[in-house]
Amino acid sequence: MNLEKLTTETRNQKTMALDMLSVKEMLELMNQEDQRVPVAVSKELPQIECAVDKIVANFKAGGRLIYMGAGTSGRLGVLDAAECVPTFGTSPEMVQGLIAGGMSAMTVAVEGAEDSIELGQQDLVDLHLTSHDTVVGVAASGRTPYVIGGLDYACEVGATTVSIACNADASISQHAQIPIEVEVGPEILTGSTRLKSGTAQKLVLNMLSTASMVGIGKVYKNLMVDVKPTNEKLVERAKRIIVQATDCSDETAVKVFMTADQNVKLAIVMVLTNMSKAEASVRLDHANGFVRQAVN
C-alpha cells in the first residue's frame, strides 16, 4: 500500500512551517483550512441525498442504520448513533455504531483491529444483518480493511451499502452502492485525519441521521418531537417543544405532557386537535407518526 498517493497523507504546502508559527497564526491557518470542509461536502450532496432516500426506505421496512469504521472514523459513527436515542427517541438497536476492536477502542487504540477484513464481517454477522439494513462504512483514507470486509458482507446479505471517504477514487468506493468522497485536501498536520477529514465525516453523518429521521416523522417543523425526557434538561426541553409547536401556555403544556405520559408528539397532537389521549393516539398511528399529517 502506498500511502503517499493518498491526499489525506500528503503534506500541506501551506503548513510546512507549522512549528514556527505563533499561536494566533496557527489558529488562523487552521480556521482557513477548516473552511474548505463544508464546500467539499456540498459537492457530494447528490450522493448524500441518495443515501438518505435508501436509509428512509429501509427504516420504513423495519431496517437499521449501522455505521462502521476504525479509529476516529469509528468513534464518529458511535457518537452519531448514540445521539439518535435521546434526540429522536430511537431504540439503541435502530442506529448503531461499530468500531474496529470493539467499544474499548473508543478510548484506547486496539492494534491491528482495523487491518482485519474478517473482523468487519464478523461484527455484522453478530448483528444478524438483513437486507433491510443500511451499512455505512466510514474511512478517511478510503482503504480500511475492517470497513471493506463489512461492506462486502453487507452486499452479500443484500443490505444497502454506503461509503464515506476523504480521498478521490477510494478503495471503499468500489465496495459500496452509494460512494461518498469528500475531498478536503491535505491536513495541516500531515496524516492527522482527525482534523479536516473527521470534521467532514461528522458533517455527512449529521446529514444522514438527521435527514433520515425527518423522513420517518421524528420531526415536526424544526422540532425534535420524539425526544425522550430522560433527565431534567430534556423534560424542560420537551415542555418547551410543546409550547413552541402549539402556542399553548406553559401550564397547558405541562398538563397535557403529563396526560400524554410524557409523550411529546402525542401531547402536540392532543393540543392542536383538541382530542383526548386515545383519539390523538389513533390519529397519530393513522398518520404513521407524522405530526403534520395527524393534525391536518
Swiss-Prot record:
All copies of domain SIS, residue ranges: 55-218
Alphabetical UniProt keywords: Carbohydrate metabolism, Lyase
Domain of life: Bacteria
Catalytic activity: N-acetyl-D-muramate 6-phosphate + H2O = N-acetyl-D-glucosamine 6-phosphate + (R)-lactate
Cited PROSITE patterns: GCKR, SIS
Pathway in which the depicted protein is active: Amino-sugar metabolism; N-acetylmuramate degradation
The enzyme's E.C. designation: 4.2.1.126
Sample GO molecular function, one term: ether hydrolase activity
Active site per UniProt: E83 (proton donor), E114
Pfam families (alphabetical): GKRP_SIS_N (PF22645)
UniProt xrefs under CDD domains: SIS_Etherase
Gene3D superfamilies in the record: 1.10.8.1080, Glucose-6-phosphate isomerase like protein, domain 1
Entry's Gene Ontology BP terms: amino sugar catabolic process; N-acetylmuramic acid catabolic process; peptidoglycan turnover
Protein function: Specifically catalyzes the cleavage of the D-lactyl ether substituent of MurNAc 6-phosphate, producing GlcNAc 6-phosphate and D-lactate.
Further comment: A lyase-type mechanism (elimination/hydration) is suggested for the cleavage of the lactyl ether bond of MurNAc 6-phosphate, with the formation of an alpha,beta-unsaturated aldehyde intermediate with (E)-stereochemistry, followed by the syn addition of water to give product.
Family of this protein: Belongs to the GCKR-like family. MurNAc-6-P etherase subfamily.
Quaternary structure (record): Homodimer.
Name of the protein this chain belongs to: N-acetylmuramic acid 6-phosphate etherase 2
Taxonomic source organism: Lactiplantibacillus plantarum (strain ATCC BAA-793 / NCIMB 8826 / WCFS1)
